[in-house]
Amino acid sequence: MRKLTTILLLALAALSCQTEKQNPWNEDWDKPDQPDKPQPVATAKPRYVWIDAAANFDDYGNSRDRIREDCKRIAQTGFTDIIVDVRPTTGDVLFTSSVAPALKRIDRWKGSSYEWTERTADFDYLQAFIEDGHAAGLKVHAAMNTMVGGYLCPYGLGKEGMVYSDSSKKEWCTVQNRPEGLVNCLDIDEYGARFLNPAHKDVQAFVISLVAELAAYKELDGIVLDRCRYDDSGLMSDFSETTRKAFEQFCGHSVSPWPSAIFSPGTESLGSAVSSLQREWLTFRVKTIHDLVEKAAAKAHEVNPKIRFGTYVGAWYSSYYTSGVNWASPSYNCKTEYLWASADYQAAGYADHLDYIFLGAYAGADYIHGTTEWTMEGFCKLGAKRLASAVPFAAGPDIGNSSGFPEGGKGSLMPDIVKTCIGNADGLFIFDLCHIKMYDYWSSLKTGIDAYLKTVNNQ
């Protein structure tokens, strides 16, 4: 018994003499258990659908019920956001404004010709979409055609918009360097939108005022500038005296003869050689748009710090210089790829001033896959390269107007389109809602979106 007691005492003594490291296999034995680090949760990318004002006006211009019903269906299909056009190409508006006229009518294609559709309702069009979109679980963004002020309509419908109703606004309009000479766009008899001059200080102030009015809608989720560019005549615009003075100040010398020192009459795109003055001219145009976008973004955030601000652009960057827009990141070295670009042109990339951007990947129905422009996949991949992570972007096709789409019957392509575009961008963008409805693409788009969401949930 005494021997057993001695052994026990020796064992206790040995334990008492151990170091503080009681459990050498676990140094932190005496510390509280730490919870496992949470694994990052996969977040689904946003899915946007555009709602063009003119194309959808018969449904929504005078019917709050249809707005409510279709917002629900859009959400049920799997879209997360709607982009509502509230300033179509006439330049009149579908929101509360003290600086732009309210839209009273719009020309609509009615089977065999264009006809006027009158707005008889008095509800706030934008506010209706905000309320009904949010009720359906959608985020709501307002888009406006920025550099437009009127429209010359076909089929004898005549003229519409503030540049036609207010004669003082003619000086706001672009002057084109046409084959017959310098012509104000209001004096041209070709059908289409009439563009405002981005270099005109009064035009810039007008645009900023419109942005401020949109931002004043406190529940609005975002503002998207569409057609924030020079007009559809390519490099023929703008050669007004206002622009001449601004350009000469920009480059620091007089330009004579005007405008042939830059381009001969009727020039719409560049040739194989580009002069130093032409590079300065192209840089001046993109810098003009850059500065306007920067000011508009600042105004939107000043009025409403929570609102997002962005633009829609065509993804065809290689020829978008004709529109006077450099939507890329200023870190994208465009001057090594394009002979028309300079270091100053590169610096005028405006992507870093945006909260988001929408790229029209408007390839034809037979060109979903590829690595180049004019394929949807190529547009997305090149867009990512050019934006260089400066801003998140959504991309997608025009499913009603691009080659192969106008005939409809492309529902079988929608799942692949969704997979391709959302897989190579930060979000999906579909133009336009009217085409989804016209060709009944609801279920095929839902199939594609559901398949995408399944991959997110399995991560």
Label each residue range with its predicted role.
Residues 79-90, 125-187, 224-227, 305-310:
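Glycine-rich, aromatic-flanked loop segments that form ligand/cofactor-binding clefts
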Residues 40-61, 142-217, 267-278:
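Active-site-adjacent "subsite" loops/lids of carbohydrate-active enzymes
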Residues 94-107, 148-189, 227-269, 322-333:
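Aromatic- and acidic-residue-enriched segments that line the glycan-binding/catalytic groove
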